[in-house]
């Protein structure tokens, strides 16, 4: 029998006022950025969680955002100048050059799960980067990733 320790997440309810963005609600309640090791069940779309993480003024840290679909990656790349999208056309070499670009203080990568596995991890390995320590990772729309992998309880 597998003796695994089960951990539970502490539930904390944070309220978003009508017309308020998630970044504003979090800051009002003591969180300067999206918290680590948390599941945010924000129920409604368009509150700005991904925008907050991809904006270096709102989230001054290196970030990797994983989207379930390429179309979401494409749409969000268009909204930010210094965000590196990972598509079929983006090579590991190009991604490595982005990660080495000293003119970009906070690296922001947006990718699909496949791009993360086949390109982001390879680029990080080639640079001897520990992206698990050097980057914040946001799984956007994680419910889609779970559904698409046919998760069963």
What are these regions (language model features)?
Residues 3-35, 54:
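Pre-Walker A adenine-sensing motif
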Residues 45, 49-91, 114-118:
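Conserved Walker A/P-loop ATP-binding site and its immediately adjacent core
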Residues 32-41, 60-62, 107:
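Pre-Walker A (Motif I) flank of P-loop NTPase domains
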Residues 40-51, 70, 141-149, 153:
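Conserved helicase ATPase motor motifs in RecA-like P-loop NTPase domains
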Residues 115-153:
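Signature of the SF2 helicase/ATPase Hel1-core->accessory helical subdomain module
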Residues 31, 55-57, 98-103:
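A general structural signal for short secondary-structure junctions and capping/turn motifs
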Residues 65-66, 108-112, 138:
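Structural recognition of the conserved hydrophobic beta-strand(s) that form the central parallel beta-sheet
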Residues 81-131:
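Inter-Walker segment of RecA-like/P-loop motor cores
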């Amino acid at each position: 029998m597998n003796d695994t320790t089960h951990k539970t997440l502490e539930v904390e309810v944070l309220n978003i006022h009508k017309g308020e963005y998630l970044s504003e609600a979090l800051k009002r309640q003591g969180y300067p950025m999206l918290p680590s090791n948390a599941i945010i069940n924000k129920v409604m779309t368009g509150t700005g969680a991904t925008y907050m993480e991809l904006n270096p003024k709102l989230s001054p840290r290196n970030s990797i955002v994983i989207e379930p679909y390429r179309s979401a990656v494409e749409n969000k790349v268009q909204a930010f100048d210094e965000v590196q999208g990972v598509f079929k056309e983006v090579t590991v070499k190009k991604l490595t050059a982005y990660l080495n670009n000293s003119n970009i203080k906070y690296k922001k990568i947006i990718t699909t799960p496949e791009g993360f596995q086949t390109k982001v991890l390879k680029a990080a390995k080639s640079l001897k980067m520990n992206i698990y320590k050097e980057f914040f990772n946001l799984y956007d729309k994680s419910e889609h990733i779970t559904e698409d992998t046919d998760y069963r309880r």
